[in-house]
Amino acid sequence: FVRGPAYDALTGAAGAGQGVSDWPTYRGDSARSGRTDADVPTSLRQNWSIPIGGRLSPPVVAGSSVFLAAVDRHEIVALDRRSGRVNWRFVAGGRVDSPPTVWRGRVLFGCRDGRVYCLRASDGEPVWTFRAAPSDRRLTAWEQVESVWPVHGSVLVLEGGADPAAGDGAVVHCVAGRSMFVDGGMRYVRLDAVTGQLISETVLDDRHPETGEPLDADVQW
């Protein structure tokens, strides 16, 4: 766990909630419903376009900004919602394979370097970083160096008592790893969304959670 320059400024700040026209996470909300209550016109027109280059994730929208990942360049890019002007860029330690989640003035995302990042939405300053991977082992995948236990970009944030382990606080849910059957399995990690501190970790591997025996011990061919 590493505190960033914006940690003290945001730790005690509630931040603005979601607006009706926002789309702050993958598929719009924590239920991944893919729906919105905003009025969407049947006739659309293009307001702006901007060249960013390379593979891009789908965008998310919160307040006056649009956020997306430039996947292979390890970047999170923030754009002005009305003009498309680049507000800031942040370079992470590996590929970011899907859009970030914007929550109460914070931009949260997982990275293929095995970490979860929290940035200040207004300027991209780091708030905190947490290594969800059990160690800092690396390998090469698709011509990129990344963690043995990568974290997918679109982390899930649940708040308002949705997670009993955190009471009324907000929780970041993410998984580090590639498969239950290699490299010691996968790590299901829950973090305090404000402080970045670990709430709990569950190892998902090839052993039965109650007996400790291999899951395929009783499989008959």
Predicted regions and their residues:
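Repeat-blade elements of multi-bladed beta-propeller folds
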Residues: 23, 53-76, 93-117, 144-188, ...
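Short, ordered coil/turn segments that flank beta-strands lining enzyme active or ligand-binding pockets
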Residues: 42, 82, 103, 112, ...
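A short beta-strand motif that forms part of the nucleic acid-binding face
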Residues: 82, 94, 122-123, 149
